[in-house]
Each structure stands twice: as structure tokens, then as C-alpha cells.
């Protein structure tokens, strides 16, 4: 049984994560778990400030730093990396058609994530053919859902605006993924809350 990975405590997968892993094994296209989207605005962007805001958002979000690992028996675990040091790419679609830009981002979305000790999301800063600026985001559904995706992108925007414009407040702290994970695992292990739910339904 794995207890630590790269110096980090490890945790079991939740029921939902196990379910995603189960059906992915039977899908011919492993990118079935990928969620891709883009967020752009018709204004000039300070790319270095945006890049710094993305790194800061990663620092503030445990859920976006999830890594997975398997032990010798094939059991899967998760842990939280200390920080993200990956290069945040910039892609300029100026001179391309809208269709070409969309096709490129769809190709990005079709690439499944590596499972072992690998980041489970990707951010690319983009300029679209019509001059809009922003980010493309790709996440694995084992770690990202619609709500967490929106919260993460919102945090990037608020961090950027705080750094760039006077009078914009610093965003509130992000909720702890680990705290919620521990609650979920306790619930799944047969907590009183689970018993009440079973009796109710």
C-alpha cells in the first residue's frame, strides 16, 4: 500500500474518480475524459501579467495540482504537487481562419493526459484570428468539472485584474481540495451522513 509519493502523502481515489477510470479503460479514445474550453475578450492583454496570474492561480488551487500514481499492485492514488513550473505557452492565431484555430484547439483537446505523476490540465494563452485575447483550458474530468473549471478561470481573471488595475480587490482564497477530499472519503467509508442518506432514500 502506497503511503507517500515524491514526498507527498497520497489519498485513495473517490468513487467518482474510480468510475471515470473504469469506463475510460473500455473507451477506444482515451481523451473521453477531456474537457476543453476557451475564454477570450476583445481587449489587449499584458501576457506576462496573465502568465504570472496563471501561476498564482495554480499556487492557490490544490485541485489543479492533482497527480495520480499506481502502486505495484495497480492500485491508484492521488497527491498534490507543491507547485506548477510548466511553461505557460502562448499561441497567436493571427493570420489563421476561425476554422483553423478551432481545429487546432480541438486537436489539443483530443490528446489524452498521461496518468502517472503527470499534470492533469493544460493552459495556453491565445490570440484568436479576430483579435480576441485570453486562454484555452484543457482538463481531465478525473480532476475537473464545470464548477471547478469556472472557479479556476475566475480566479485567474481576478488575479490579473488585481495586478493590472487599481481598486480591484484581491480574490478570496480558493477552497481546499484536500479538505473536501477527506470529507468525501470519510462519507464513502460509511459516515453518519452516508447512513442518513441511505435511510432517507
Residue ranges and their predicted role:
Residues 3-13, 17, 30-49, 99-103, ...:
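Gly/Ser/Thr-rich phosphate-binding loops and adjoining beta-strand/alpha-helix segments
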Residues 103-109:
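Short Pro/Gly-enriched beta-strand edge/turn motifs at strand-loop
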Residues 44-48, 96, 143-147:
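A generic structural signal for alpha-helix starts
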Residues 5, 10-12, 16, 22, ...:
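Active-site-proximal acidic secondary-structure segment that organizes catalysis
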Residues 37-41, 91-93, 165:
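Generic detection of short hydrophobic beta-strand segments and adjacent strand-loop junctions
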Residues 32-34, 86-90, 145:
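Short small-residue beta-strand/loop micro-motif enriched in glycine and branched aliphatics
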Residues 65, 109-115:
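Short catalytic/binding micro-motifs of nucleotide second-messenger systems
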Residues 1-28, 51-98, 119, 154, ...:
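Short amphipathic alpha-helices and their capping loops
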